[in-house]
Amino acid sequence: MNPPITDMAALGRQLRCPEGALAQEVADYIFASNEYMIRQTIDRLFLTSGERILEVGFGNGGHLPYLFAQGDNLHYTGIERSEEMLLRAREQYMSLIEQGKAVFLKATEGAMPRLPEEAFEVFFSVNTYYFIQDLRGYFERLYPMLTHGGRLSLGYIDKDFGERMPFTKEVFTFYTNEQIGQWLLEVGFSSFGISSYTEEIFSKNGRTVTRPFHIAMAIK
């Protein structure tokens, strides 16, 4: 699937926060490009029935049926900075909202909404950390929201690969696995580990590209 925007700088800004007339097309492009990574990140959570899940950056929400198929009586809280994506999710998944199985919240700029302590057993996010200015501080604010033994799963593309992409020059910041692990451990997480993968994707000119990505996992 080709990106709906040919201006790479503009595409990068839309990947950060889909908005305007192209928001839906951009969000669908993001999901199509990242579905495998999203599913792998969810799989690393090893969800069990009744768990409460927090996700930052749910995009078009196309992965939620897969997520809810992982266990019974799951409860999902999704946080998203894009107003268009928030409205789409609330409309598309109204039945989950009405059943008390899902909540969709608006993120403030670069900050985690205030949520109760020990409210979630699991947290995951895919391709979002690049846009957070103070990532260590973000992990620090997230930590109290997880229960004791709570699990974190963070999916992201490899730093060297990401920095070579034409759309990452403005609003993206990449870190090494070691830096991410150091920050997670500093704020209190333990049992940090990395799983690394590759997948074949299509570039904007139709060529096949091997994209390396990682999933960072940690336990409170």
Short names for language-model regions:
Residues 1-22:
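N-terminal, positively charged/glycine-rich alpha-helical extensions of SAM-dependent methyltransferases
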Residues 22-42:
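Conserved SAM-binding loop and adjacent beta-strand
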Residues 54-111:
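Class I SAM-dependent methyltransferase SAM/SAH-binding core
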Residues 113-123:
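A short acidic, Gly/Pro-enriched loop at the edge of an enzyme's catalytic core
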Residues 121-134:
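A short SAM/SAH-binding and catalytic strip from SAM-dependent methyltransferases
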Residues 136-148:
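A short glycine-rich, Lys/Arg-flanked "PGG" loop and its adjoining helix->strand segment in the class I
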Residues 151-181:
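Conserved class I S-adenosyl-L-methionine
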Residues 190, 200-220:
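Core SAM-dependent methyltransferase catalytic element
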